[in-house]
């Protein structure tokens, strides 16, 4: 829990849950596991506010509670983790992915679950059907069965999962580690439940149908809620696997060509269910299987497929590896190595954009050759000595390059020691990840500052929009509308447009930095699991 | 390292291997922190635009806006201003409506997090509970409350004469204690400590009825138990706060 992570989590909590939850959340992040009394005492908030904030945090999975460390009688302790709160940055990406895979219905289901934290299936289906009905034309409404089928599809592909049952929330919990959702065998099973009904429009035009629906809804709601407390949440890990696969496929498409990326996509699709999330590489697939599973639009002959596979194996990026000769050649996708290469490319591009292409050349050289002396750097990079020295020192002062001493004698006498320059990929990636968190926090703060500066102007424009909307709804003449519109003067309108542009840019920049965060985080986590 | 070399001209490390030649001088030492916004030699790349980026942006802003209106967005109790005003009594309940909309499943939360919401002292009705487990209790309450509305109307008339001074102070815990003692409902669980420290949530009778019974009561006068709409209680302190930039329109 670094300082930058805590700062960013605080800003995210403030924006999405209000400042009370922010205070409680940052206090928990900084101080570790605490019980209720300590939290109340140290944050100085009222009891009810603290209780409500804790409930909100638990509801959204940001805080876990367990019985105290001193034994069964001690008060429950609450602890919070940065990871879950930092996911909030990625919510738009999750919703967009659901939309591309399962359409508008899937998009709204995921959005509802993200907004509420945990929800029952029936609750989600009802809310989503109502929302979809709002946007449909008059007279049509959304059937529950369609929404339920989208929900079930999301659960089958593991994008949604059941919340782990908390063993006796009021009683003592003997296990120290809270159970993960995966430890329950029913994690991905949709309960057999029929939800009959249609979405309700808020302003009901047809009273008769609505009354009938309302009656049926009441009956069904009693049926469905008899299933005791099965709550669903979004499975972030599955989304992350999806993003990782997408990153690999687009990297292959950029480096090689479209057909190779299709081959890799087919291989990844075939190994979706057989590969565990922490696996280093997918299960070996034979060239025959790949040939059979290629999409119908890509009818390439078999020898061409073999050539493509050989090309992929020989590529220095090592996305695909050969694992054997049976079945026409067994091929695997090297997931961890691909992630490492993607992270390395990110580091290189960071150095290039910040310090120029010659410094980037030195950086790449050091990554490849591991340890080099000052003179060797100058020779290999073909850069004159003075400039190479300058660049190396700049990189060294930014901590992107490290100095390694190799003594010739046991007393580290400077005249008899080798000084080698080196780049360690993992610590550098971690450092850049912290820089990314700091960047996003700065972007958010700047955006809040800009909105605060122009708060009065924003409020005025909101009021005028509300007046316009109400006038239009009540059917006013165009002169009245133009009169109201003219209440905002031209310079104010310019100011508003500039403000909107800045805020959009800052928001968009946050989204983009989050993509880098995802890559670096996946890389760091993959090394942790492989070594640990 | 530099201190030891002060008396002699040589430095502690060999100059050749690190690459500093004899003739060159070291760069000047830094005497103050680096500037907050240093000049960048390379300008950063522009953001990737495109349809996907714009859609993601719209999703993000919509999500933020939607979260503000959900019950999980908790506003702190509004700070009291320097002088109490009559309109505070009617304004303070406006913000707390969203809090009661969310009835969590208490089996998933530790028992100590349960909040027992109190009704304001003006009503003679029993204390409302945010306990969602007991659906049967809810139904009993519905019936009970309808009867008690009638009783309440009578007691209100009596109480208004007695409590004319205490009406303006919603945070009066003594009033609440008195009301607790009068209360016939014996099933309630109290925490001794939270009883003393809790701040009243002013949830009015009107809003609770709309939650429990589902009847479509209109906002405004019923919510605040007055005969006037809420803009009647605007005390004129917000007037004139708009921008004075346009000086060609005279303000009367």
Regions found by a protein language model. Give the residues of each.
Chain A
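N-terminal alpha-helical scaffolding segments that mark the starts
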Residues: 1-44, 56
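Hydrophobic residues on short alpha-helical segments
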Residues: 21-28, 106-111, 260-267, 348, ...
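Short acidic, hydrophobic short linear motifs in intrinsically disordered regions
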Residues: 24-25, 30-45, 116-141, 166, ...
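Intrinsically disordered, low-complexity regions enriched in proline, serine, glycine
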Residues: 36-38, 51-52, 65-67, 75, ...
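Residues in the recognition helix of alpha-helical DNA-binding motifs
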Residues: 53, 150, 263, 308, ...
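A short, conserved structural fragment
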Residues: 58-69, 148, 152-168, 301-302, ...
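Short, amphipathic alpha-helical interaction segments positioned at domain boundaries
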Residues: 76-111, 168-254, 335-364, 412-456
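Long low-complexity, intrinsically disordered regions
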Residues: 398, 442-532
């Amino acid at each position: 829990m670094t300082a930058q992570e805590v700062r960013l989590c605080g800003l995210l909590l403030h924006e999405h849950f209000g400042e009370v939850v922010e205070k409680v959340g940052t206090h928990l992040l900084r101080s570790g596991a605490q019980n209720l009394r300590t939290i109340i005492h140290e944050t100085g908030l009222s009891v009810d506010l603290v209780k409500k904030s804790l409930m909100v945090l638990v509801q959204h999975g940001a805080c876990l509670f367990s019985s105290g460390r001193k034994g069964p009688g001690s008060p429950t302790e609450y602890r919070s983790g940065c990871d879950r709160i930092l996911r909030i940055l990625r919510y738009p990406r999750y919703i967009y992915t659901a939309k591309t895979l399962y359409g508008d219905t899937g998009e709204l289901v995921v959005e509802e679950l993200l907004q509420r934290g945990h929800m029952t299936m029936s609750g989600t289906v009802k809310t989503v059907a109502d929302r979809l009905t709002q946007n449909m034309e008059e007279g049509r409404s959304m059937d529950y069965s369609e929404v339920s089928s989208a929900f079930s599809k999301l659960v089958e592909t593991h994008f949604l999962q059941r919340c782990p049952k908390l063993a006796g929330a009021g009683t003592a919990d003997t296990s120290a580690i809270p159970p993960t959702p995966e430890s329950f065998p029913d994690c991905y099973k949709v309960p057999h439940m029929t939800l009959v009904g249609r979405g309700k429009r808020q302003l009901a035009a047809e009273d008769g149908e609505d009354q009938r629906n309302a009656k049926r809804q009441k009956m069904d709601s009693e049926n469905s809620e008899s299933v005791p407390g099965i709550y669903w949440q979004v499975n972030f890990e599955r989304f992350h696997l999806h993003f990782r696969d997408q990153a690999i496929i687009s990297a292959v498409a950029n480096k090689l060509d479209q057909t190779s990326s299709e081959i890799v996509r087919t291989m990844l699709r075939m190994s979706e269910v057989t590969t565990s999330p922490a696996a280093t590489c997918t299960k070996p697939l034979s060239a025959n299987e790949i040939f059979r599973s290629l999409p119908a639009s890509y009818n390439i002959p078999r020898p061409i497929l073999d050539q493509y596979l050989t090309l992929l194996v020989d590529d220095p990026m090592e996305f695909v590896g050969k694992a054997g000769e049976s079945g026409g050649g067994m091929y695997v996708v090297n997931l961890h190595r691909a992630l490492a290469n993607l992270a390395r490319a990110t580091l290189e591009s960071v150095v290039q954009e910040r310090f120029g292409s010659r410094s980037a050349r030195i950086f790449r050289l050091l990554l490849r050759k591991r340890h080099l002396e000052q003179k060797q750097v100058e020779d290999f990079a073909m850069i004159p000595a003075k400039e190479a020295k300058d660049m190396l020192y700049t990189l060294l002062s930014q901590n992107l390059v490290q100095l390694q001493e190799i003594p010739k004698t046991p007393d580290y006498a400077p005249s008899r020691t080798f000084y080698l320059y080196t780049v360690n990929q993992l610590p550098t990636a971690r450092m850049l990840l912290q820089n990314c968190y700091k960047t996003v926090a700065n972007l958010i703060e700047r955006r809040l500052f800009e909105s605060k500066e122009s708060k009065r102007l924003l409020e005025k424009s909101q009021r005028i929009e509300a007046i316009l909307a109400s006038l239009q709804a009540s059917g006013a003449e165009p002169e009245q509308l133009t009169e109201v519109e003219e209440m905002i003067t031209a310079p104010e309108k310019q100011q508003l447009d500039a403000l909107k542009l800045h805020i959009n840019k800052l928001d968009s920049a946050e989204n983009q930095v989050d993509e880098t965060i995802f890559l670096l985080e996946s890389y760091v986590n993959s090394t942790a699991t492989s070594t640990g | 390292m530099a201190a030891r070399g002060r008396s002699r001209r040589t430095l502690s490390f060999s100059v050749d291997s690190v690459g500093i030649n004899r003739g060159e001088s070291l760069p000047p030492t830094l005497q103050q922190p680096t500037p907050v916004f240093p000049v960048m030699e390379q300008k950063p790349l522009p953001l990737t635009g495109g349809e996907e980026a714009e859609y993601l942006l719209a999703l993000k802003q919509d999500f933020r806006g939607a979260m503000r209106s959900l019950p999980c967005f908790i506003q702190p109790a509004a700070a009291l201003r320097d002088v109490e005003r009559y309109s505070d009594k009617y304004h303070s309940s406006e913000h707390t409506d969203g809090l009661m909309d969310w009835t969590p499943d208490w089996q998933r939360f530790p028992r100590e997090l349960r909040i027992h919401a109190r009704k304001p002292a003006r009503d003679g009705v029993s204390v409302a509970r945010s306990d969602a487990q007991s659906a049967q209790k809810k139904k009993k309450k519905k019936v009970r409350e309808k009867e008690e509305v009638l009783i309440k109307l009578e007691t209100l008339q009596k109480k208004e004469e007695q409590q004319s001074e205490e009406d303006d102070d919603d945070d009066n815990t003594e009033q609440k204690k008195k009301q607790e003692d009068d209360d016939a409902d014996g099933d309630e669980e109290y925490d001794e400590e939270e009883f003393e420290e809790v701040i009243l949530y002013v949830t009015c009778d009107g809003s609770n009825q709309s939650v429990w019974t589902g009847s479509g009561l209109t906002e405004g006068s019923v919510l605040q138990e007055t005969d006037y709409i809420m803009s009647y209680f605007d005390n004129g302190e917000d007037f004139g706060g708009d921008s004075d930039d346009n000086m060609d329109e005279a303000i009367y």
